[in-house]
Amino acid sequence: MAHKTVTAYQSAAIFFSSVIAAAATFAISVIAAYFLSHSEFRQFQSAFWPLVFGIYGITGAIQQETTRAVGAALLQNPESRTHTNSLSYSAVAALLGLGIAAIVVMTSPLWSSAFPTYPQMSVVLIAFGVVMYAVYAAVSGASAGRDSWYFYAALGSGEALIRLVATLAAVMLSWHLLGFETAVVVASLIWLPCVVFSRTGWRVWHASIDVSSRQYARNIVMLMLSSAGASILMTAFPFFLQFTTQDQSAQFNALVAAIGVTRSPIMMPLQAFQGVAISAFLKHQDYPLRALARPCLWVLGIGGFGALLAYLIGPFLFDIFYSKYAGLAPGMMLAVLTFESAIIAVLVLAGNLAIALNMHRLYVSGWVCAAALALLLLHVPLDVVSRTELVLGAAPLCGFTVILAGILRSPKGESGKSTDKSGLFQDAPATRHEKS
């Protein structure tokens, strides 16, 4: 059977969706910096936003595994259209979301001090958001697994636009911080109208997976361990950074804003194309490292060019959009942060390859190593900017090295010959029951 590839129009739709998402995220950050006080902006930008999207990042393991499971099921049986498990993938995702929400509520006394304003409501909003996002991630993953790329793009751009519109509504209604926080989480409801009012959405909702519900859940939980590491480096980093620094000045707020604006141009499109990447790697398992090399070189090239632009014109643009923090984002800092975003992106691509090869343990190992090093380096006695640059450069390089070494040692590496005697990096093969 010939493998379906993503067409130019589908790629354009996904790219356009990622541009909308990046632009909406940037716009929300600028709006928050303008309308919120320094203390409110610090809570929103360095506590609520990174924590929410850090937890969303962990929950995003549902999307990755659903893409693999649905895509693998279609490769095995192209006519497959309905699941054969007692629980659908979306029901399993919802249950996992409820479990994460329960953990959020139970652990909130340990971290809710980061929200001096509306602490209880902030916890409730996060718990609600994670349940809705779990289902959103499952539907998005299933659409990628089925190669329903226009629907996939609509989900991504729709969520971002709803978040932006809700933020503007909060400004017009003078809801301030609580309104901004509410706007962040309500966007995850986008999956509901997309499934109810779209034929494609309905078919995606009833997609089948290649393993049992129990194995599907186990795979997701394992991926969540590594997704926690990914969240530390990508979305939740400012939350952990504020716990290791006593800096309450505007410089810290400027650094957090700079991390966001230098990351979005690379990471937002990459996150939008993760489903495409996993789907493509699934279809090129005979030469996995060759399939990985090209996108990595592209990402690093874009990162280098972006770093040059950030150095030359970044401070000027930053001062325009973040006028409250003018003069606090030098060009060298913006350039380093931009290129380090490309390094993180390379780690994300390597992780996607590990998932496509069904090497979940290796995926976990890479991200856990990166996260552990990041948390360790956060305590190095340097100024906050130097410490941030050290963490965001060294940690993803460590994780990428672990994953690359694991693939080379596995029988799924380029040579096709295994040098891994321990079996550490190989998942157990699915049983007949797990494929039912």
Which residue ranges define each predicted feature?
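Interhelical loop/hinge segments that connect adjacent transmembrane helices in multipass membrane
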Residues: 1-7, 150-154, 177-178, 183-184, ...
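Signature of the first transmembrane helix
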Residues: 6-63, 221-244, 396-398
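Interfacial transmembrane-helix starts/ends
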Residues: 8, 45, 78-94, 217-220, ...
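Transmembrane helical elements of multi-pass membrane transporters/channels
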Residues: 10-25, 158-159, 163, 180-195, ...
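Interfacial segments at transmembrane-helix termini and the short loops linking adjacent helices
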Residues: 38, 107-126, 312-342
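Helix-loop junctions and terminal segments of transmembrane helices
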Residues: 59-76, 258, 262-286, 355-356
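Hydrophobic alpha-helical transmembrane segments
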Residues: 119-124, 153-201, 369-373, 385-411
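Membrane-interface junctions at transmembrane-helix termini in multi-pass inner-membrane proteins
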Residues: 132-154, 168, 339-366
